[in-house]
Amino acid sequence: LSGLAAGGIGTVVNVGADMASTKTTIALTEKYPFIYGAAGVHPSSTAELDEEKFAELRVLAQSGKIVAIGEIGLDYYWEEPDHETQKKWFHRQLNLARELKLPVIIHSRDAAKDTLDIMKEEHSEEIGGVIHCFSYGKEMAAEYLKMGFYLGIGGVLTFKNAKKLLEVAEMAPLD
């Protein structure tokens, strides 16, 4: 971490993926002045959530340097947790973001339609945020951009088979 500033990095947002990593994130934000955090439970970890843990997440998300709710969303690549469990906690975490007036960091893999449908149901355009590791096509990108979301496009863009993602990068605004 001490080498970040020398590398030109002034601020880090460390993102929680489950209850344990959200707690670790908060500890890092308290230790380092340049680290901020996102509190949330990744779709692949939603089976760990219940009402008690969600109440704890709500408290954690109100820690001083939490700047987003994430990483949240849907991931249908794996069979577990089941889709209904993921959807339930995606809805709940979107509502938590709205309640706390924080943007979201959305994860969506093999769940394009359901992710977009839930985001529209929850009026996520009022929340804002980023679709991280975006991997869908131009049509889906246009929907998210209309909602005011940023698209996080990673190194997959450099892969030879990333033609649809290259089209997205070409059509998306630079800001």
Question: What are the language-model segments listed below?
Answer:
Residues 1-175:
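Mid-domain alpha/beta scaffold segments of enzyme catalytic cores
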